[in-house]
Structures are given as C-alpha cells and as structure tokens.
C-alpha cells in the first residue's frame, strides 16, 4: 500500500469549475479543489445593489443564454488558465495563491479573469486546506482565538432593490443582541420574524407576507416609519423588549440619490437634512445600526452622521467595498465606524481578512455579509467566527440559502462547547 507524503497531502492536484444557479435563478461560479488528501467546494454570491468600486463580476453578455448573465467565460478562465497555474501549489499557502491570481489578472478590479473566478478558487482553496488538515474551517482561518459567535442582523422587511414595494430604504433588520447564546439569538429572531408576519397580515392582508430576495417580507408599505412601527409591534408581540432586540437599517442610499438630493418617503432631502432625518429615527426607534446612509462617495456626510450619532453603528458597505484603500480613507476621515465585509466585493479571502484586520485595529466593528443572490455555501459563517466579527448579516430566518449560514453557526457553537461566547454589543 502506497502512503502519501506529508507534502503531497496539501498539494493542489485538481481544480475544476462549473456554472450553477444562485438563489435568484441566475448563473454563478462553483469551484472544486482537490489536494492529496482533501477537498474544497465553494460557490460565489452576487449582489443586486452593488457599489461602483467593487471588483468586477465577469458575465458572458450572450443574450441567447440566461439573458446575458452566463458565467462560462469565468468558468473557462479557471479551467483553461488558472487551474494550470495552481497545480502543485500548497493549499495552505492562501496568501501566495491569492497574490498569484491577482498578479496574473493584472488589473485593479480583477476584470481579466473576473472576481467571481478568482474568489471561487480562493474560497475553495481555504476549504481544501482545512479539510486536508482535518480541522474545522473557522478554526483553520481564525486560529486558537476563534470562539466568538456574531449577533445576527436579520433582514425581515425588504425594500428598495430587494422588493417590489415603495420603500426607499432597502433593508429593515432585527438584531437579538440581548441573547446569551447564538442559538437563543436565532430563536428570538425567528420568533420575532413569525410575529412580524402576523402583524403585517393583520394590517395589510395575506399578500403582505410575500418575501423578497433575502427572505424578508415585502409588504405594501411606502414609508420608513410604517415599516419601523411594524417591527416594534412584532418585537413586542414576540414577547421581547427593545433592549433585547434592536433594529438595523440598510439604506443603500446610492440607490435613491439623484446626484444632489435623496428621495425618501416622498421627500427630497439635502445631505444635512438626511442627517437630521436619521437622528430623528434613532431618537424615536431602537435603532442600533445604519448601513450606507449616504451615497458611496459621500465620505464627509458619513463622517457628519458618525459624529452626531456617536453610539450608533454606522456601517460602510458601498462606501468601503471591503477595500483597504477606501477603508483607510474612511478611518482617516472618521467616516462610519464599522466595515461591512463582503468577500465578493474584493475577490479574495486574503484581501477580505486584510480589510477586517485594518478595521479592527482602528476600533471599527466588522459585519460579515451575504449578498442578495446567494448559494448554499456557508463559508461566511466560518469567516465571521474566524475574524471575530461583531454581527453577521445573512437575511431572514427563511429561505434555505439564508438559513444554511445560521445553521452552520449553530454547528460551530456546538463544536466550541463551553468556549463559545456570544458577542455583546
């Protein structure tokens, strides 16, 4: 019987990509990586509202296939080019592999091969390495200090580009921050989600419980206050207090900015007026966090709100796009106080971890996030624990591409046992 050498255990022996479907029925990239004694499979998410500074997601633009949204070019870039470069490399050398792909691509936004191609390999490499070593992915990525479970921030009312209603704000979220364990937090969130369904159905009819891309309800609500009132009622109906479950907003404000003013709740507001608008909401409702409250280039306005709302988590998503250069600018200007981490915005695991490290070194919170078009891949759950993320944003406790991430966190909490700690905000 031939025994495999220690070095060969971790050597990449095969890389294969394919086109699969995401949760919105559009194609995405899936990558398999085989080492001498391990295997990793990863699939890449996609966003609906995207920052203009994100790494490029390569689409075929062939109108005869999937309305131009096919990803066969990205798949071919893996199978015909990148795979040959990776064969024989040690899967444990994550940064070396990521930097090689970046260098081979040769562009700032990864447009040569596509960030969806590069990220698929980057994710699958980490999974294959962990499997080869026989350790959990969160432990492989995070080391011995990975033991904190993030607070889930659950998108339970969808608006903006995530729904077909008239709400300007894209996401209304609940955050069971008062739980003592992640499993209890998930239960509290699910109970409140179901209570919200009843509140909405009683007020707006059965159609109000239709769901959007991320599992949240998409009721016929047109004002921010009506949505927030429904959340407050649901929290009370579920038997919880505002100190136990807070509210988060994702404005995705670039989507309702006309270059001069913001169109929200039927009004056009100048940036200074929008600051006051948010401050009024914070005063009235138990709002813990606001994501992308202004246009993605409005660093000064982010800084103004961060200064005024000093005890609120102001999250930069399109503002930072998980990019260390944009994040460094935000830190210097004191624009926002939290990073939204989306691995497909930047395109590699190494660069994502660099952004998280920079944020945390400067006192910024980190929120690990899904995208509106997801797959059954659960890696962001492991990443959240690995980096010590404060919150995880992965949709409502509904639709299996969302609950897959929550269920993975339950498994991680179980694996950690008595060492598990639930983040306190």
From Swiss-Prot:
- Pathway in which the depicted protein is active: Carbohydrate degradation; glycolysis; pyruvate from D-glyceraldehyde 3-phosphate: step 4/5
User: What cofactors are annotated for this protein?
Assistant: Mg(2+)
Entry's Pfam families?
Enolase_C, Enolase_N
> What is the E.C. number?
4.2.1.11
Chief place where the protein resides: cytoplasm
Q: Which HAMAP family match?
A: Enolase
Quote a single Gene Ontology cellular component term: extracellular region
Supply one GO molecular-function term: magnesium ion binding
Q: How is the cofactor bound?
A: Binds a second Mg(2+) ion via substrate during catalysis.
**Which sites are catalytic?**
214, 342
Report the SMART domains cross-referenced here. Enolase_C, Enolase_N
Per the record, the similarity remark reads: Belongs to the enolase family.
Report keywords, A-Z. Cytoplasm, Glycolysis, Lyase, Magnesium, Metal-binding, Secreted
Give the function comment from the record: Catalyzes the reversible conversion of 2-phosphoglycerate (2-PG) into phosphoenolpyruvate (PEP). It is essential for the degradation of carbohydrates via glycolysis.
Positions annotated to bind (2R)-2-phosphoglycerate: 170, 342, 371-372, 393
Subcellular location(s): the record lists:
Cytoplasm; Secreted; Cell surface
Q: Where does Mg(2+) bind?
A: 250, 291, 317
Quote the protein name from its UniProt record.
Answer: Enolase
Q: Name one GO biological process term.
A: glycolytic process
Q: Which InterPro entries match?
A: Enolase, Enolase-like_C_sf, Enolase-like_N, Enolase_C, Enolase_CS, Enolase_N
Catalytically driven reaction(s): (2R)-2-phosphoglycerate = phosphoenolpyruvate + H2O
